Curated annotation (Swiss-Prot):
Organism: Nitratidesulfovibrio vulgaris (strain DSM 19637 / Miyazaki F) (Desulfovibrio vulgaris)
InterPro entries recorded: IF-2B-related (IPR000649), IF-M1Pi (IPR005251), IF_2B-like_C (IPR042529), Initiation_fac_2B_a/b/d (IPR011559), M1Pi_N (IPR027363), NagB/RpiA_transferase-like (IPR037171)
Documented EC number(s): 5.3.1.23
One GO biological process term: L-methionine salvage from methylthioadenosine
Organism taxonomic ancestry: Bacteria, Pseudomonadati, Thermodesulfobacteriota, Desulfovibrionia, Desulfovibrionales
The keyword Ribosomal protein is annotated on this UniProt entry: no
Sites annotated Transition state stabilizer: C157
Pathway(s): Amino-acid biosynthesis; L-methionine biosynthesis via salvage pathway; L-methionine from S-methyl-5-thio-alpha-D-ribose 1-phosphate: step 1/6
Name by which UniProt lists this protein: Methylthioribose-1-phosphate isomerase
Functional summary from the UniProt entry: Catalyzes the interconversion of methylthioribose-1-phosphate (MTR-1-P) into methylthioribulose-1-phosphate (MTRu-1-P).
SUPFAM superfamilies: NagB/RpiA/CoA transferase-like
Gene name for this UniProt entry: mtnA
Listed GO MF terms: S-methyl-5-thioribose-1-phosphate isomerase activity
List of residues binding substrate: R47, G48, A49, R89, Q196, N247, K248
């Protein structure tokens, strides 16, 4: 499943599989402008930190074509469009990371002709896209060692191929274990209110013939108490320098339950998701989404008119609850301030 984000150079379009419609319908959402990209990000046509980063990189290419219509004044126009993309969603650090990486290419190009910049940016976006798949497969190999034969692994939200350029982070670890010949099964928490676990994780694993059972979010403690969960593996949208990890709302509760029941809790994320400029989880911005995602199921209203809603998209799991962070350079262990710094040195990213 590596074709849900496709760039068509001839059409100057980014073609996204519309994840809002899965698993019952498979339709494309075509982006030709900056606003198309921003809309796709905000309404979650595409979601998941690495996939958001890849989409943003290709969005920069579309923004360049759009800015070219301003003639000689395209530089400031392009700058504004890039910032519009970078601010589309606040929590996933890969969004700003990808835009900044494209900006760096622009800066290096200096006053090169527009056609040269487009060529450089298409190459860089393609590299970001390709590298993400390779990074996820590396994480899968490292993380597979954490999963034992016969394990049932719980995961929350969707950190699979659909949340990345391909293969997945948390689901990459699960796929890595299966590729290593281990017979395992998965519990996918439904993940209210957007139901990424029920709709997307179950869809991916079922398509790959990996045994998966969907559980309502409130069943986590019961399942662990009954000994039905041996490991928990989740993804992350931003990891602070101290190892605190922001992931889909409800992850913190799962981590607390895992500690109570002695179930190892792991986070799988590329180094690009680690924000060393954010000291701890208290400094991670948390997106507050539209109340309608909670007040309605489809077109059916389920709450009384006028009742306020909390719809935080993410929460922060403290580093103390995380047994290990699976990255492309290996599994990081506490104390994370030290192991994160060492991982960046190992990757040559100091």
């Amino acid at each position: 499943m590596e074709h849900h984000i496709r760039y068509d150079a001839a059409q100057r379009a980014l073609i996204l599989l519309d994840q809002r419609l899965l698993p019952t319908r498979q339709e494309d959402f075509v982006c030709r402008t900056t606003e198309d990209i921003v809309t796709a990000l905000q309404v979650m046509v595409v979601r998941g930190a690495p996939a958001i980063g890849v989409t943003a990189a290709w969005g920069c290419v579309l923004a360049a074509y759009e800015a070219a219509e301003a003639g000689d004044h395209w530089h400031p126009v392009l700058d504004g469009l890039l910032e519009r993309i970078a601010k589309a969603r606040p929590t996933a650090v890969n969004l700003r990371w990808a835009v900044d990486r494209m900006r760096k290419v622009w800066k290096t190009a200096g006053h090169a002709p527009f056609a040269t910049l487009i060529s450089l940016w298409e190459s860089e976006a393609r590299r970001i896209h390709r590298d993400d798949i390779e990074i996820n497969r590396a994480m899968g190999r490292h993380g597979a060692a954490l999963i034992d034969e016969g394990d049932t692994v719980m995961t929350h939200c969707n950190a699979g191929a659909l949340a990345t350029a391909g293969y997945g982070t948390a689901l990459g670890v699960i796929r890595g274990a299966v590729d290593a010949g281990k017979k395992i099964s998965v519990i996918a928490n439904e993940t209210r209110p957007f139901l990424q676990g029920a709709r997307l994780t179950a869809y991916e694993l079922h398509e790959d013939h990996i045994p998966v059972t969907v559980a309502c979010d409130n069943a986590c403690g019961h399942l662990m108490r009954k000994g039905m969960v041996q490991k928990v593996v989740v993804g992350a949208d931003r990891i602070a320098a101290n190892g605190d990890a922001a992931n889909k709302i409800g992850t913190y509760s799962v981590a607390l339950l895992a500690r109570e029941h002695g179930v190892p809790f792991y986070v799988a994320a590329p180094l690009s998701t680690i924000d060393r400029n954010t000291p701890d989880g208290d400094h991670i911005p948390i997106e507050d989404r539209t109340p309608r995602e909670v007040t309605h199921v489809g077109d059916t209203q389920i709450t009384p008119d006028g009742v306020p809603v909390y719809n935080f998209a993410f929460d922060v799991t403290p580093a103390a609850l995380i047994a290990g962070i699976v990255t492309e350079v290996g599994v990081l262990r506490p104390p994370y301030t030290e192991s994160i710094a060492e991982a960046f040195r190992k990757a040559g990213l100091e």
